[in-house]
Design a protein with these regions (language model features):
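FMN-binding flavodoxin-like domain, especially the glycine-rich phosphate-binding loop
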Residues: 2-3, 7-15, 20-46, 50-171, ...
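Short amphipathic alpha-helical segments at helix-loop
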Residues: 118-121, 175, 179, 212
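A mid-sequence, solvent-exposed acidic-amphipathic segment
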Residues: 156-195
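Iron-sulfur cluster-binding cysteine motifs and their immediate structural context
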Residues: 182-183, 188, 192-221, 225-243
């Protein structure tokens, strides 16, 4: 079994590890131009961004070929997912690949412009994350065939947001998310921000006003990994609702670097 995943702060890597099999990071696969995926079972585990899939996931899926007897998709989300799984199924269907099983997992949301991390962390117990994962793992082990039903409102929300996000102006706006980042004097130049970026959008070799500090480009994926994983909490977003940071406790920063580094 092969799992194609995308992670920013560890949630989707953790879910992928719990499912098991050979874990393949989408940013690494994209960088290495590995588009032929073959296996008895192939799974796609990704987060929900703006009621749809992250652009990096869409970009990769549109280039792949999949040969498998069993295909499943899992999407993690914080509050609302809309019809986020639908774009994946549509892309794969155009390639002649039918999804056998799809499901969702509600987890901690790390999107700082919308959520106070203090409040998000308090919801962890109520979300029964481990129970959700256990159910999905069992379903996959049993090769269950069932797709998550998506209502009309959910489909509509995903369609509308998808058109905005994936349009040329929408894409450009997302890529410029890092224009709203700023770095404090707490920065030590450790380069973790550079290594966890799935787009190679951070250059720690540059200096800002003669001080160590990352230089952000215009290829941001809006995953906020660089902000959340900074060990000194030195990177901030002007529109953030919280200075508290999040990383899935079951995943190490080193694992996220291995998954995302473009260096």
């Amino acid at each position: 079994m092969k799992i194609l995943y995308f992670t920013g702060t560890g949630n989707n890597l953790y879910v992928s590890k719990k499912i098991g099999g050979e874990l393949l990071s989408i940013p690494r696969l994209l960088k290495e131009k590995q588009f032929d995926i073959k296996g008895e079972a192939v799974g796609i585990v990704v987060p929900c961004y703006y009621f749809t899939v992250p652009y990096i996931v869409k970009e990769y899926l549109e280039q792949i070929t999949i040969e498998a007897d069993y295909v499943f998709t899992i999407m993690t989300y914080g509050k609302m997912m809309g019809g986020g799984l639908n774009p994946i199924e549509k892309i794969l269907k155009r390639k002649g690949v039918e999804v056998d099983y799809s499901n969702k997992i509600q987890m901690i949301d790390n999107f700082l412009p919308n959520f106070e991390m203090e409040q998000q962390l308090k919801t962890e117990g109520a979300k029964n994350i481990e129970t959700q994962i256990k159910t999905i793992v069992t379903d996959i082990q049993n090769r269950k065939k069932e797709k998550k039903r998506i209502g009309l409102f959910q489909k509509t929300a995903t369609t509308l947001f998808g058109k905005m996000i994936f349009s040329a102006p929408g894409r450009k706006r997302i890529q410029k998310t890092s224009a709203g980042f700023y770095v404090t004097d707490a920065c030590t130049g450790c380069r973790i921000c550079q290594e966890v970026c799935p787009r190679g959008n951070v250059d720690q070799r540059e200096k800002i006003e003669t001080k160590p500090g990352p230089k952000f480009g215009n290829r941001c994926e809006s995953c906020l990994a660089c902000i959340h994983l900074c060990p000194e909490n030195a990177i901030h977003l002007k529109s953030q609702k919280s200075s508290v940071r999040f990383k899935n406790r079951n995943v190490t920063t080193a694992e996220i670097i291995a998954a995302n580094s473009q260096n």
